[in-house]
Amino acid sequence: MRMSAGLSLLLPLWGRTFLLLLSVAMAQSHWPSEAGRDWENQLEASMHSVLSDLHEAVPTVVGIPDGIAVVGRSFRVTIPMDLIASNGELVKVSAVGKEVLPSWLHWDPQSHTLEGLPLDTDKGVHYISVSATRLGANGSHVPQTSSVFSIEVYPEDHSEPQSVRAASPDPAEVVSSACAADEPVTVLTVILDADLTKMTPKQRIDLLHRMRSFSEVELHNMKLVPVVNNRLFDMSAFMAGPGNAKKVVENGALLSWKLGCSLNQNNVPDIHGVEAPAREGAMSAQLGYPVVGWHIANKKPPIPKRIRRQIHATPTPVTAIGPPTTAIQEPPSRIVPTPTSPAIAPPTETMAPPVRDPVPGKPTVTIRTRGAIIQTPTLGPIQPTRVSEAGTTVPGQIRPTMTIPGYVEPTAVATPPTTTTKKPRVSTPKPATPSTDSSTTTTRRPTKKPRTPRPVPRVTTKAPITRLETASPPTRIRTTTSGVPRGGEPNQRPELKNHIDRVDAWVGTYFEVKIPSDTFYDHEDTTTDKLKLTLKLREQQLVGEKSWVQFNSNSQLMYGLPDSSHVGKHEYFMHATDKGGLSAVDAFEIHVHKRPQGDRAPARFKAKFMGDPVPVVNDIHKKISLVKKLAFAFGDRNCSTITLQNITRGSILVEWTNNTLPLEPCPKEQIMALSQRIAEDNGKPRAAFSNALEPDFQASSIAVTGSGSCRHLQFIPVAPPRRVPSEVPSTDVPDRDPEKSSEDDVYLHTVIPAVVVAAILLIAGIIAMICYRKKRKGKLTLEDQATFIKKGVPIIFADELDDSKPPPSSSMPLILQEEKAPLPPPEYPNQSVPETTPLNQDTVGEYTPLREEDPNAPPYQPPPPFTAPMEGKGSRPKNMTPYRSPPPYVPP
């Protein structure tokens, strides 16, 4: 009875106690979620106070995870409509603080997906805002819900295999397709005649989808990047083939995917599905762009790099002593970043020594810095990086950490499963005295002074990501090395890993080549971008400032603009020097080809600028600046579309061609569009053209003349404004052209051919005259030869003598005094017998009066009949009887 009474008294007491405990348990079970929601609302409110496009009264929706994109890889994320617009509200997706999305993203409202393909210029973090609005009573859009998430675009890492970089939806597939650490990756690349910078994000994604349907390769395995420095083909390729494109018009795009690991010509998979369609045009018809060619090459295995780690600070207690263990930890809730968090305290002169603290999670390989100062070993929390702490540590404040490079060694610590590892870009200067320069103070650490480690308190917020750029930052923070050389090893010479080999350039076309980071490798300074590069000639001479090839050692960019005198092969040497003074050399050739279009360009652009042409012609930097400005005026980001033809006097007369125009048939519409873009119909430059070239070049007039397939057309200036496309352009060019292009055509097509024909006729006439005169100086005929006996001595016949002259007087002797006396005359009888007279009767009668009266005198010998003296002809011939007439016949 007493016991039953006691039970009756205890039952109400136990009931009340049980109800109290149950209510407390229920309160405890609901408390964390309420606190989480309250903390989340506080963070969202802090974000809404900063973002201009979101109102403070708009409730936030959590559920869109942050995304990661890689340059050249397709990105796709689906927006959950049940969380944003469950009641059919209007959804708006844009960049935070802007009205539109980033240039590489495309929003598809039908499938509620956000997709795109980033390029190298899109690297960084992009914050995307997704908001739902409803049409209000007054016609305005009233915000209902909103959400903000981030997309970080990582750069393309050439040293990492493609299978690892591929953003595959199945991680197991990525691991299974990955190659070994020392095994090269075989990649097939298709070269397209396309310009990714001119495509919209949807066009890039559609191109990948068409290639997927053609080649049956998944999107996450394909990579699409633009051509850099006109390097269309890979010199290390072991297989290659042509496409259907005869020439390259655009900048070019490379679409590639992985074939396997360490393949060669013997074990490469069947590529007939690429080889024949690329050559015959089937692939081009499917993709919508011309195919230039394809090649297969093996990519070298990656070089191990440091992995930057990010510690998720959590209040979870862990054991400070003993090896790291794996602790079960829920991933922290996503925190929307705000400019108000974290708070950075002002710097002071205190320094925090390295501390150690095991972080729970999956073990991974990280890097620990060994300094020159020996610290006292202590047991405490493990901190994997050296933290430069300023001021007193206050819970809730996050200090930016700075990684100090030095001698590193791997240590096994644990990181959370949700940790995102990132590769920092840090410089590695020479070992020096450890110092940390802040904006106001300089702190030096005493040598070998034991210091009690100060534990860094944990906070519940996410530490920001700190990037250390190699270029000089705007702040005065310097990163120095406090370590010593590794084991006192001597400095090793840099090694040449990949040759530059050959660089192709064209006359009048600007080119630039970025030296790849895997060209040289140094054991101390690592990749090529950490070395000092110098471009030299054969005789160890540096390239001069006036050379047509220039090299920027800071950006490691080689560029130039050759002219017609540089056609051929030129040998140069690239010297890579490490910080210890040791260097390696790579010899390569620059092949300069003739103009890509030659004289077949369909149009020639001429512009007249004010100034002296001599400084422009003699300064390679001014010529390159002119080409870049001309390309910018046409809206081309690729300067190789402009081919500089000539720079002459007459102020500054510049003539160039546009390589984007097809040669045949005549691209009349395209030329007219380009002409109207830069000049008016009367040849006056437009404001956009002038603004693009000023202040260095001030244009006064522009002329566009057809050539090649359009040689009969004149575009700028034109007589009437041509508004109807079907009008045929007039071939009668007015004389208002400042550069007198019409007169040049007249000289080229009329005057010069006429002069050439006249010269040919004149030369032919001179040759005919010479031949005629030589023919007249030939041998005499037989009749003419019988007329003369001796050359130059005339023959006088008897009937040609002049008998009218009187005979000579007998008083003048016929024999001169200096001559010898003749022989005595013969004895003649005294009788005169007519028949013995040696002369004829006429002669005796003629000379009879000349005889002496003395009968005993000898008979007179008459002189020869030629009595007239021969003036200037020398002596007479002695025997002339054969040419005299015979004496008359006298009968006996």
Curated annotation (Swiss-Prot):
Residues 46-68 are annotated as: O-glycosylated at one site. The chain crosses the membrane at residues 751-771. Pfam families: a_DG1_N2 (PF18424), DAG1 (PF05454), He_PIG (PF05345). InterPro entries: Alpha-dystroglycan_domain_2, Alpha_DG1_N2, Cadg, Cadherin-like_sf, DAG1_C, Ig-like_fold, SEA_DG_dom. Residues 733-742 have a biased composition (Basic and acidic residues). Residues 378-497, 721-742, 820-892 are annotated as: Disordered. Residues 30-405 are annotated as: Required for laminin recognition. CDD domains: alpha_DG_C, Dystroglycan_repeat. Residues 410-444 have a biased composition (Low complexity). Residues 829-843 have a biased composition (Polar residues). Keywords: Cell membrane, Cytoplasm, Cytoskeleton, Disulfide bond, Glycoprotein, Membrane, Nucleus, Phosphoprotein, Postsynaptic cell membrane, Secreted, Signal, Synapse, Transmembrane, Transmembrane helix. This is Dystroglycan 1.
